[in-house]
Amino acid sequence: MTNANPIPKRLLVAIGGNATHPENITGTSKEQESIAAATARALLPLTQLENQLIITHGNGPGVGKTIMRQVLARHRVTPMSLDICVANTQGVTAYLLMQAFENALRNAGNPRHAIGLVTQVEVDPSDPAFARPT
């Protein structure tokens, strides 16, 4: 028997870090909330399908700006390690997207909920890329 529904049970949407934090913004909360809301509205039709929607996101520009802030403030506060910076910005991006999706779902009368999951990064300290950072 063939599956009558050609849409897979799980849909994965990957949102790049530059999509959530483009270069043309200063990074205010309002700007980031607006981008998250637009993203949620664009993806909302996928939540009406009979599937599991999984959204992943990058955070490259955000973590870069966090590190810049730390460099500028290093004489007043102790800088965080890279893994903590990544977790910090990953959490902020996830929070903004979850909040935007919850609002979009509620406004559409959709009973689904957004759930966030922070992942861990493993870095090899002997990676030769550390000799020539970009």
Could you tell me what each predicted segment is?
Residues L72-T134:
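Ligand-binding beta-strand-loop-alpha-helix segment within the catalytic cores
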Residues M1-N59, K65-L72, C85:
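N-terminal glycine-/serine-/threonine-rich phosphate-binding loop
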